[in-house]
Structure formats: structure tokens, C-alpha cells
Curated annotation (Swiss-Prot):
Its EC number is 2.1.1.226, 2.1.1.227. The lineage of its organism: Bacteria, Bacillati, Actinomycetota, Actinomycetes, Mycobacteriales. This is 16S/23S rRNA (cytidine-2'-O)-methyltransferase TlyA. It comes from Mycobacterium tuberculosis (strain ATCC 25618 / H37Rv). One of its GO terms (molecular function) is toxin activity. Keywords: Cell wall, Cytolysis, Cytoplasm, Hemolysis, Host cell membrane, Host membrane, Membrane, Methyltransferase, Ribosome biogenesis, RNA-binding, rRNA processing, S-adenosyl-L-methionine, Secreted, Toxin, Transferase, Virulence. InterPro entries: Hemolysin_A/TlyA, RNA_MeTrfase_FtsJ_dom, S4_RNA-bd, S4_RNA-bd_sf, SAM-dependent_MTases_sf, TlyA.
């Protein structure tokens, strides 16, 4: 039977860290990978056969692969982050939160229904307010300390259409909202294929359009659509919407449909 130990102790045993203190610092900086995924806590149990790696300083070490998704969206939409107050709904380990901080966010509210997932380096950052055991549908300006200038969302096992009222309610009228649409949670269960993957491009288009139209009902218009550069863990292709209240940059109904189909055809 494989021996199990704390990941910080195992890093020292394998010579990947000089001490448990250094191991904890590496984990807090997002530089340790457990079977390819970011280590979140020094106390995480691993076996002596678990693949452990430490990212070198020459590589940009994000706390989760999700960071690469948001980087792609912010660059595609040319959204400025510096100096803005932000909400990260569905923060999990904090990939989106880290990207926002890296791009100069003044303040990030990291909200998640789970507990103890956010990386230590982010949890201890004075610019971050952590809201755990918090359902995104229950978010309010009062709960997050006032309205924000930028909302990002990476939510699972829930339809964005049901969460949008809370998200837009937390945003200032000048804000940008960038939610990640996951078709597997928007279409009916009977339309999800083997492994939980939505293969049909038409179903994916329908799910993105449904979220965009729900946003429009709430007074938020689609300015852009972009496929995430990384698929979800099961292989689902996911899509970012860029929402604003201003109508001068809004896509027309036909323009929105064209943008969605283009994002699907150009996506991974």
C-alpha cells in the first residue's frame, strides 16, 4: 500500500523543497503541481507515488488552469482591469482572482459556494475579500461591500440564466460583466452526451444565445463573444460573453448570432 503524507512533507522528502516552510511558500505562490493540478494547501494528503512538480521561475505559475481562460478573454475583449473593484463569482482556487490582481485590480471579492479552496497566496492578499459558502444567486451589493466595476464568473452545476439577476445587481451601470457560459449546464440533461459533453454546435450556440438574451432582458447587452482557449475538464468547449449596459457598442440580434456562431467555429 502506498504511503500517504502531507504534500509539504513529501516535497521535502523528495528534495523539491529545503523545508516544510519553503514548501508552504511554494504552494502559496502557486508553484506546486499535484498530478498536474495546482496544490492549494500544505496539508493536502498525497501518496509516495503521486506526481509532484515545482514550476520554475521562468514559467508563469497561476494557481489554476482557469487563469488561462480569463487571460484569453480579457485580451480578446481588451478590457482594462487596473484600479477597478471586481467580483469573482465561483472563485474556487482563485485562477480568475489571481489574473485580476495581476492586472492591477484594486480589490477583488472572491465568492464561492465551497469552503477552503482559495489558494493561500490569494486568501492572505489584503486586496482580496473571501466569501465562502456563498451561493452566487444570493449575492447582493450589501453582501460584497458595494457595487463593483467588473464581474467575472466561472460557475458549475448551475445555469447562468438563474444567476445573472444577482450578478447584474452587484454591478455598477458602468461595469463590464464577463461570465463563462458552460453549455453542459445550460442545455437539458437529455441533451448532454456521453461523459457530460455537449458535442452539437447548435446546442452550444443555443445555450450561449439563451444566456445573452436573458442578460438583455435585465438591461445588459452583449458586446462580444469568445470561445475559452481551454476546454473544461471533461472536454466541453466554453464561451465568454462580454456584457455592458451601453447600447452604442451592443451587438444587434443578427450580429449576436453571427458572433456566437463565429466563436463556435473558431473555438477549440
Amino acid at each position: 500500500m502506498a504511503r500517504r503524507a502531507r504534500v509539504d512533507a513529501e516535497l521535502v522528502r523528495r528534495g523539491l523543497a529545503r523545508s516544510r516552510q519553503q514548501a508552504a511558500e511554494l504552494i502559496g505562490a502557486g508553484k506546486v503541481r499535484i498530478d498536474g493540478l495546482p496544490a492549494v494547501k500544505p496539508a493536502t494528503a498525497v501518496s509516495d507515488t503521486t506526481a509532484l512538480t515545482v514550476v520554475t521561475d521562468s514559467e508563469r505559475a497561476w494557481v489554476s488552469r482557469g487563469a488561462h481562460k480569463l487571460v484569453g478573454a480579457l485580451e480578446a475583449f481588451a478590457i482594462a482591469v487596473a484600479g477597478r473593484r471586481c467580483l469573482d463569482a465561483g472563485a474556487s482556487t482563485g485562477g480568475f482572482t489571481e489574473v485580476l490582481l495581476d492586472r492591477g485590480a484594486a480589490h477583488v471579492v472572491a465568492a464561492d459556494v465551497g469552503y477552503g479552496q482559495l489558494a493561500w497566496s490569494l486568501r492572505n492578499d489584503p486586496r482580496v475579500v473571501v466569501l465562502e459558502r456563498t451561493n452566487a444567486r444570493g449575492l447582493t451589493p450589501e453582501a460584497i461591500g458595494g457595487r463593483v466595476d467588473l464581474v467575472v464568473a466561472d460557475l458549475s452545476f448551475i445555469s447562468l440564466a438563474t444567476v445573472l439577476p444577482a450578478l447584474v445587481g452587484c454591478a455598477s451601470r458602468d461595469a463590464d460583466i464577463v461570465p463563462l457560459v458552460k453549455p453542459q449546464f445550460e442545455v437539458g440533461k437529455g441533451q448532454v452526451g456521453p461523459g457530460g459533453v455537449v458535442h452539437d454546435p447548435q446546442l452550444r450556440a443555443r445555450s450561449v444565445l439563451a444566456v445573452a438574451r436573458r442578460a438583455q432582458e435585465l438591461g445588459w447587452h452583449s458586446v462580444g463573444v469568445k470561445a475559452s482557449p481551454l476546454p473544461g475538464p471533461s472536454g466541453n468547449v466554453e464561451y465568454f460573453l462580454w456584457l455592458r449596459t451601453q447600447t452604442d457598442r451592443a451587438l444587434s440580434a443578427k450580429g449576436l448570432e453571427d458572433a456566437v456562431h463565429r466563436a463556435i467555429s473558431e473555438g477549440p
